[in-house]
Amino acid sequence: MKYDMNHRKNSDDTPPASRTVKEMMAEFQNKLDDGDNRFRKQPPPPPSPRRAPPPPPHRKPASLSPPPDDENTIRPPSSSESSENIPEEPQELITPNTTRRSLGPKPTVAPKPLFLNGLLPSSSTSDVSSQNSPKCDPHPSCTTPTILVSPATSEYSNGVFFGANETNGSGVKDRARQLVNMGFVPRMQNGGTGTPSERPISQVSTLSQVSDEFDEGDTSASDEESMNSEKHLRRHRHEDDFDELPLPKNERKTTTVAATHSEIMNEMEHLFVRGGKKNNGVHKQQRRQSNIDEIPSDVGKLRDNRKGRHNSLFVSPTSGMSSSSTDDFSRITSMTSDRSSILTSHSGGEDSTDGASPVPDYETGDEKDDQRLKKLHYAAVEFLKVQNNYVQYLKEMAVLYPEYMERFGKRVGRDLLASHNGHENVVLQIKKIMVQILPIHEMLLKEIDKVCSNWDSRYPNMSKTIGTFADFLKCCQPFLDNKADFLNKLLQLRNEDKEFDEATYMFETEVFKRGKKGAVIQQLDQVHQNFMRYKLLMLRYSEYLIDDCDEKEKAQEAIQKLENVTQAVNQKMGLPTTEELTKLYYRFQCQFNVLEPGRVLIRQSEVMKQTRKELQPRYLVLFTDYLWICRVSSSGQFDINRSYRIPLEYMKFERMEEDERIRCLQIRSRVKSALIIFSSEKERNQWTDDLTKAQYDRKSYKRRQSTAVQRHDENKKKMNKLLMLTPEVPDASDLERPQLIDSRSRSMSCESQDELSSVPVTPLDNGEIDETLGFGEVTRNGSGKKPPSEMIKPVWLPDNISNECLMEGCSTEFNIINRRHHCRDCGWLICKFCKGQAPLSKYDFTKQNVCSECFDRHYKAYKDGVLFPSKNMIVQSDETILVKIGKRNDKEIVDPRKLFKAPVNYGFRHRNVEEKRAQSIVFGRVYLSFRSRKTETVRHALLRRDDLKLVFYKAELDSKSVLELLIYGYFYRETPLDDGWLFELVHRNQIRTDDTKDDVISFRVDNSASAKKWSAAFADKLELDPTRG
């Protein structure tokens, strides 16, 4: 650095001789050595309006700053200047004969280069240009040439100080001593025997500090500049304060159960954070001290921000210990987890894999190959995600759940893990087996982590790890053999032990956040479903491998190993094989998780569905929680957009008992209603039995869940009465998780409780008086039970079931002009004259086609004020009422009167179609044939009871017959055929001639049950033909 002192005039006013910079610096140093302290640093400027940050516990504040000046150069003081403003400061005198002491301690953490005045070095010459200076101009008093200050060390080998062209070591040391005297570099206190002082925190320093607030130290900058620089200079927390981070604590005063839960979580927090990391604290301290001796090789050079050293002391926002993690699950999992950030963090981003390095683009020159390599990278990282989640689940069930139950029992004064019915507690039994499973999967997780940490899709090597551990997966067999017993014991214990059930409920809802409500019982299937996941992951992984490569062959071998293991386990358990589930998973186009915990495949088969015009093929899949009615595409996969997923608890099914529909099953639900036709009556009965059992189990689970919510609500109400000593209105900040969970549980229960479910729910009012409506009647508030006709979608009658309108009094026959219509409320077949329009609740109160009878019912409900829920009504200022209709995301406000359109045939009712069947001896579908015709015609025939007339109809529900025959005097013949039974009615004339022919009517019945009824009716009313030999 040059110090231009030529502008100073000497006291004798003689022009100074031309001297070099070295000579001027030597003269300046002699003055300092003689005790002239006028060039020492000035007192610090007045403090900034912003509060300075508190120093860390291990640091001592050093408020050294360069002296202000008016020029761009440093001038020696004149004799006229007063020395009163120069503070006397004891310091170490440095002479050429004295031994130079250490210039200060080495930094604890290697800092980035410190650039004075915010300027970057652009050259190594003495005069450095400022073309790379930041946008804000530096302070006028600090516009000296750029100086790059390295951390205080015992050697200064950089040639960028002062005269870069001077290479002698003594010159560099002299310049270093000048930096010490000027305050840019810390000095040793008390002659070097005391505690060393740290380098002062500069306004451009990026070292991590404890406080989140900081002081720039520059009072000349504007507030806007300060705010902009604050974003880039935010201090991070120091490692010493890592264990002191305040964890969120839910202070609840609502129930004893909630208070007990809070105490337990606080204890477990202390157990895992304070106690479990005592040894790690020593290691961290040693590692931090060891960093003192580590000086990176690139100190003094410009480093890329992306390649900067990662500060392990800083807790990233994606970590489990972030300040935003306020729930108990995040706290406990972050306490117990000792894995790396790649396992514990779950950051978003397309190119990010759970906190790991971004997935590279693999620029090979071929775009398709680049995409393949990138997908292969994602497939490899997916192994790590799945295995990490599974290991975490095992830890929660084997460690966290028993510990939680034990501590909860101590709070309530009894042992919740005591023996039950003379046997060891089921929680301890589960713990014993899962503790044996956990080490194997931790080893597998470690190996997968090792592979993923050095992953390169051009050299894949995941198959070897999976193939090696495939045989060890059999360690889960003992748990799978006893899983059904564990399930029954848990159910029994929760039903009998109220406190055990409450503790489990709190653990499920507050800590164990897996699946719906995080049910512990439902998650027991995780162990078995883990088998299936490995093969699915390997299949996806192998898809992106190049054919005829070694890794492809190893992947196929690993897949076969996994298949053998899962086949053996599934055969022993009597469950579907992995291959079957894998095929089903891909038929769902990977859009439905067949391996969801608690979800088991029960049955699947091809069926036929009766549509309004014809029979169409469908594929029926039954799980423990859903029934799928799938439309199969030409490729064999399911068309998800045109398939229906029906929850079992919201469904009704009914066997059709008519002879022609003995293979049919009618399914009705709020999602979809249909008539399913199976291949045989036996298959229909098997499906009905499985549906009945699956629905019962599902409702039982919902009932237990709702009962737990009710108990929690009752306890909360009781404790509120005891704790409400002073009337206080809780604000929004007091609404902690239990209240939110309870309200959500109640709403879910209320939505699932209708006429189809026997699950008990919290009592809710069915209506409320709303005087603003003007009707003076009780209106529904939208949360009570609704009639089945308002919730269940109807099964439409097929078009060929009738050739005429089915409304009583209407004689319209369907043809090209008069087309068929279906009522959306009851599924009835009507004509255009009997069709009206009305809003239906099952279609979100949108306007739909209805028959005359349904229109009358809904219009009467509208007049009575009970059709629309009060939450859907909007009262205008002029007392007119508007309603909200449509789906949740597509609401529309309309005038309710515009939603109704009366039919032409107003007031007509449904025809009694059962009357015809009730007045007959036998009724069914037949195939009528005449002697003059060789073809058969489908007809529906009945034998009338009162007059013994055989009547044939064109359609099943027609009222007009096409043929009537009085069967008195007829003989009958019956002949068994391969496709049914043939019945012939023969009438002979009393006068017979050679050309006389018998009058014969024949028809075939394809249903065996219907054929028996026809045979019995003819045998009772007619005589057998005697001519039949």
Swiss-Prot record:
One of its GO terms (cellular component) is cytoskeleton. CDD domains: PH1_FGD5_FGD6, RhoGEF. Residues 1-155, 185-254, 279-370 are annotated as: Disordered. Zn(2+) 2 binds at C823, C826, C851, C854. Pfam families: FYVE, RhoGEF. Residues 141-155, 200-211, 335-347 have a biased composition (Polar residues). The keyword DNA repair does not apply. Residues 375-572 form the DH domain. It is found in: Cytoplasm, Cytoskeleton. Keywords: Cytoplasm, Cytoskeleton, Guanine-nucleotide releasing factor, Metal-binding, Repeat, Zinc, Zinc-finger. GO terms for molecular function: guanyl-nucleotide exchange factor activity; zinc ion binding. Residues 76-85, 122-133, 316-334 have a biased composition (Low complexity). A zinc finger (FYVE-type) spans 810-859. Disruption phenotype: RNAi-mediated knockdown reduces lifespan. The keyword Zinc-finger applies. Activates cdc-42, a member of the Ras-like family of Rho- and Rac proteins, by exchanging bound GDP for free GTP. May play a role in regulating the actin cytoskeleton and cell shape. Required for normal lifespan. This is FYVE, RhoGEF and PH domain-containing protein tag-77.
